[in-house]
């Protein structure tokens, strides 16, 4: 049995269309919203796979895939809608191609969804989905619309559609970029390098701030005691707190899950004051621009390529067909009588075709000059659109090629700086998608106005490749690669992304609707987040930013092979002589040094590539966001402070997901401790624990998300050796990973008794696709 949910996060939703495919493999994403308004006659409901009724922002549970033969799949493609054996309730089951009750007809004219097995119509019974004979009730009326695969989990801005008097965009901002909880969220002019303006929407509807791992958007205090008007602030991420969960509706309003009729807006006039208060209130109307938002980037191409195909005007007979074939021959100098087949060809000049079409005159063999003129004008329009679309992708390909043109040389130079043997079989965590996503993040954070154009194309190409891949499963091989194969791995993925971009371009060029919509985006003002207008873009600046970001991503992959972090708790001596390789906060001092020698530090030429290019020290030394250095606990000159503790392994769990985690560490029946792990941060098991005798000691670790759902279980094997410190690893056969997650290659570093530092192990956990 499945249920319906309140309105959820959606992308910019297009007008309703007849949802029909063209091949047995084609599946188009769509959403179905009930015209039934519920008990309050306000809240809209969506067809959903979830078994609760609260509104959520997870697009995946309310996105369906319609095949051309009438099957309605879940967004993962694993299950289809079917009528239960009782013939009343609707359920999710495995595909059975012989079952007619799994086939549905969507009637967009009459707003009905009919089951072909029993002829009944999709209906609602106490918020449960069922089928019933046609009855005329609103519960049987559904409006369907295209839903683009806009990804959650990427960083960007939430910008108001309302511009100030100088046509500047303003966006949601944490006041003064403060990491403190209960800080006001306000409106500020969108500007570069303002991390407090950058957010990420998670699958469950939390809106994370880039300022800190567990910092999320929350409802603030009431305005003058009102129950319908609130300020906004930040708070710590809480599980199942609907006041912290949000969605985006078809009016581009950001609504709250606890108060689904209240949306985020602002009071005041943008541009008059440097800061304008954000509020949670009820919009005056669906078109109240003070309550409408644009995400930046918008991933505008995602929506376009997920549209139902709209073919070119068909010319199948008479003078229309004759005109099309004649014009095609004239344009291509006799190469073909089907000019549209060449729109995707890289070996032809569409500009020359356009000139030839323009100069063509109607031959005497074609009697209708009107038909000839109509075809001629249509082909001229198509060529104009195709030329523009191709130019956009050619510029993107040029940018992308330049980014990777020195890939081998750059990787070699970095390896030499880090003192890494690139011919070795040492395994590193090298996820290409994370690397390229970090490049797009760097571009939009440095150039928020205009930089989104590159991200709109690039991120859409990434999503396009994943959407149309034969499998969406992401296994350990995605993240694990030997140093000797790292360049080949990166180069192969680079070529795949180039192919994805080309495939997306060709998909657009073969569809009149997609080509028309893409052409329109090419003439939006560059500052518009949906724009593909490359005129005036500073490609040199963009390329420089991208190159530095990609270099940083390579350092993130290579650094853990030779360096780790040595952490000395506050109050104890730490031999710091340079800020180049150290960082201190209230918890203690972090020093970056070689794995085998805590007194051998990275060269200045390497640290300059980090600190001189704006890399955050706090993120590097605490293994936050893209950094994943194992951490060892160290007490200099105090080896006997805690008997045997330096022979311990100190596990670090790195959370690469947007959901907080925790892990429990036990030793037999002894519970060592529970350790929290922020989103995109690392959690260090820092409890002091007596190691015991020499030999193998096993520490069981159970990782769960903030809701208590299992993520992974494994056992750390800590092998104590006399005078040698300890050797640490994941016990063979102990790793169990839940569906939806991937555990990357653990970084295992030996401890040293003589130098007074513990063994370290970092276990990275990723969300799989």
From Swiss-Prot:
A Gene Ontology biological process term: response to cation stress
Induction per the UniProt record: Induced by high levels of extracellular Ca(2+).
Domain spans labelled Ricin B-type lectin: 25-145, 116-249
Main location: cytoplasm
SMART domains, A to Z: RICIN (SM00458)
Membrane association type: Peripheral membrane protein
Sample GO molecular function, one term: carbohydrate binding
Gene3D superfamilies: 2.80.10.50
Subcellular location: Cytoplasm; Membrane
Span list, region Disordered: 1-21
Keywords per UniProt: Cytoplasm, Lectin, Membrane, Repeat
Annotated Pfam families: Ricin_B_lectin
Any single GO CC term annotated in Swiss-Prot or TrEMBL for this entry: nucleus
Functional note: May play an important role in stabilizing and/or regulating the cell membrane during Ca(2+) stress or certain stages of development.
Family that this chain belongs to: Belongs to the cup family.
Record-given protein name: Calcium up-regulated protein F
Organism: Dictyostelium discoideum
């Amino acid at each position: 049995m499945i249920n319906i949910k309140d309105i959820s996060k959606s992308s910019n939703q297009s007008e309703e269309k007849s949802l029909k495919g063209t091949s047995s493999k084609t599946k188009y994403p769509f959403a179905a919203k009930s015209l039934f308004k519920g008990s309050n006659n306000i809240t809209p409901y969506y067809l959903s796979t979830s078994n609760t009724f609260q509104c959520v922002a997870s697009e995946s549970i309310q996105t369906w895939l319609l095949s051309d033969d009438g099957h309605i799949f879940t967004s993962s493609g694993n299950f289809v809608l079917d009528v239960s054996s009782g013939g009343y309730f609707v359920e999710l089951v495995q595909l059975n191609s012989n079952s007619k009750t799994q086939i549905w007809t969507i009637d967009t004219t009459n707003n009905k969804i009919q089951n072909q097995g029993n002829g009944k119509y999709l209906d609602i019974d106490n918020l449960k989905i069922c089928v019933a004979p046609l009855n005329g009730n609103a519960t049987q009326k559904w409006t369907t619309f295209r839903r683009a695969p806009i990804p959650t989990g990427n960083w960007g801005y939430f910008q108001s559609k309302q511009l100030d008097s100088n046509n500047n965009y303003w966006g949601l901002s944490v006041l003064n970029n403060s990491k403190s909880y209960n800080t006001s969220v306000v409106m500020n002019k969108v500007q570069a390098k303002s991390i407090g303006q950058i957010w990420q929407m998670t699958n469950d509807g939390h809106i994370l701030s880039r300022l800190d791992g567990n910092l999320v958007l929350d409802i603030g205090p009431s305005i003058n005691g009102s129950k319908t008007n609130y300020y906004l602030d930040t708070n710590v991420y809480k599980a199942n707190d609907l006041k912290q969960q949000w969605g985006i509706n078809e009016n581009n309003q950001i609504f709250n899950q606890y108060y689904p009729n209240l949306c985020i807006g602002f009071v005041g006039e943008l541009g008059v004051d440097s800061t304008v208060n954000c509020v949670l209130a009820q919009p005056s109307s669906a078109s109240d621009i003070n309550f409408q938002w644009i995400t930046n980037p918008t991933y505008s191409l995602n929506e376009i390529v997920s549209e139902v195909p709209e073919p070119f005007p068909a010319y199948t007979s008479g003078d229309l067909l004759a005109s099309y074939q004649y014009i095609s021959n004239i344009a291509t100098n006799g190469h073909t009588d089907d000019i549209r087949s060449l729109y995707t060809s890289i070996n032809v000049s569409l500009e020359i075709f356009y000139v030839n079409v323009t100069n063509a005159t109607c031959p005497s063999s074609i009697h209708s000059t009107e038909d000839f003129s109509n075809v001629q004008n249509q082909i001229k329009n198509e060529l104009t659109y195709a030329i523009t679309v191709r130019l956009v992708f050619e510029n993107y390909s040029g940018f992308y090629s330049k980014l990777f043109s020195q890939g081998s040389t750059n990787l070699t130079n970095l390896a030499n700086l880090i003192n890494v043997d690139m011919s070795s079989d040492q395994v590193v965590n090298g996820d290409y998608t994370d690397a390229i996503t970090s490049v797009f993040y760097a571009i939009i954070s440095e150039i928020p106005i205009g930089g989104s154009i590159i991200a709109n194309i690039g991120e859409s190409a990434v999503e396009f490749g994943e959407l149309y891949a034969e499998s969406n499963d992401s296994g350990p091989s995605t993240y694990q690669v030997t140093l000797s194969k790292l360049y080949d791995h990166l180069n192969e993925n680079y070529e795949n992304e180039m192919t994805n971009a080309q495939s997306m371009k060709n998909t657009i060029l073969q569809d009149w609707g997609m080509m028309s919509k893409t052409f329109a985006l090419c003439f939006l003002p560059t500052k518009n987040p949906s724009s593909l207008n490359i005129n005036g873009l500073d490609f040199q600046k963009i390329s420089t930013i991208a190159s530095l970001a990609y270099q940083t991503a390579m350092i993130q992959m290579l650094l853990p092979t030779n360096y780790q972090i040595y952490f000395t708790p506050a109050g104890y001596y730490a031999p710091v002589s340079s800020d180049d390789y150290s960082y201190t906060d209230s918890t203690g001092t972090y020093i970056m040094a070689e794995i085998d020698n805590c007194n051998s530090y990275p060269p200045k030429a390497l640290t300059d590539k980090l600190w001189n290019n704006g890399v955050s020290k706090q993120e590097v030394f605490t293994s936050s966001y893209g950094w994943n250095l194992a951490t060892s606990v160290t007490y200099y000159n105090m080896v006997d402070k805690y008997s045997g503790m330096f022979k311990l392994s100190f596990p670090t769990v790195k959370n690469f997901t947007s959901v907080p985690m925790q892990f429990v560490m036990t030793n037999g029946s002894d519970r060592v401790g529970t350790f929290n792990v922020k989103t995109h941060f690392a959690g260090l098991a820092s409890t002091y624990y007596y190691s015991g005798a020499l030999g193998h000691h096993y520490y069981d670790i159970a990782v769960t998300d903030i809701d208590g759902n299992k993520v992974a279980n494994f056992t750390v094997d800590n092998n104590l050796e006399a005078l040698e410190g300890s050797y640490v690893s994941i016990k063979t056969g102990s790793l169990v990973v839940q569906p939806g997650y991937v555990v990357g290659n653990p970084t295992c570093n030996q401890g040293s008794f003589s130098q007074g530092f513990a063994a370290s192990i970092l276990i990275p956990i990723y969300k799989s696709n």
